[in-house]
């Protein structure tokens, strides 16, 4: 089977994607698959470089990769690929839209507003949300251009910076508490990990530095675990996720869980959360890649 690891891309998360792709290449069973690295440098590359593949193993992140566009191209070309489909990928990449779906389904998520320009900033609504707030690109990832803002005077500059990366910026309530991630594979919850950041919040550096943050299997009290599990699986379902995705949450100091976001192409670097969760379940990195390929192919057949 000819498997192409699709990596690189044109988003602000290109370097993370390249790291994920290299890590997958180093761990995939090369006796089982005929493997090639396919580095995307511009949009047209996807049309030219995937020809002849039996399977596309996606290691892309951010725009034109995690947002459904590449998935749609591959659907048109009838090439099976890993993970969620075009609709789910697009929906989860758009934080505003995904939060609207969660709210409509009575799934708890932090309060938020969005703006598309400096002129649209509604300081009264931000006051209602309450400082501090997070300001970040609506379609961003890996905490690129994400700012924790404590006062009104700093909102404008943070929004301006976010608008450099996306046409819409989300301003979201900060919830103090324990950050956890719920890896879901084929509709099943894998071991939950707690993220213990060494900084004020889990930013880009904390996510990808070798010693940036601790990722620890967490034991939750049963009633809380049951609630977290139900929320995570329902989120996976209502956002139309397939094969695998990571549902990030925060548990407030009062013990109330909130959905933060859903990652439809979770990182696959040496420090990434999903491979660590699989490992704690006794699934090696190489075996996990096998499972992703097998389950994704079964999805395509259905």
UniProtKB/Swiss-Prot annotation:
Keywords: ATP-binding, Cell shape, Cell wall biogenesis/degradation, Cytoplasm, Ligase, Magnesium, Manganese, Metal-binding, Nucleotide-binding, Peptidoglycan synthesis
GO BP term, example: peptidoglycan biosynthetic process
Enzyme Commission designation: 6.3.2.4
ATP-grasp domain span: 99-294
Gene Ontology MF annotations: ATP binding; D-alanine-D-alanine ligase activity; metal ion binding
Cofactors that this protein relies on: Mg(2+); Mn(2+)
GO cellular component, one term: cytoplasm
Compartment(s): Cytoplasm
Superkingdom of source: Bacteria
Residues involved in Mg(2+) 2 binding: 261, 263
Free-text cofactor note: Binds 2 magnesium or manganese ions per subunit.
Matching InterPro entries: ATP-grasp, ATP_grasp_subdomain_1, D-Ala_lig_Van_CS, D_ala_D_ala, Dala_Dala_lig_C, Dala_Dala_lig_N, PreATP-grasp_dom_sf
UniProt xrefs under PANTHER family: D-ALANINE--D-ALANINE LIGASE (PTHR23132), D-ALANINE--D-ALANINE LIGASE B (PTHR23132:SF23)
Protein name from the UniProt record: D-alanine--D-alanine ligase B
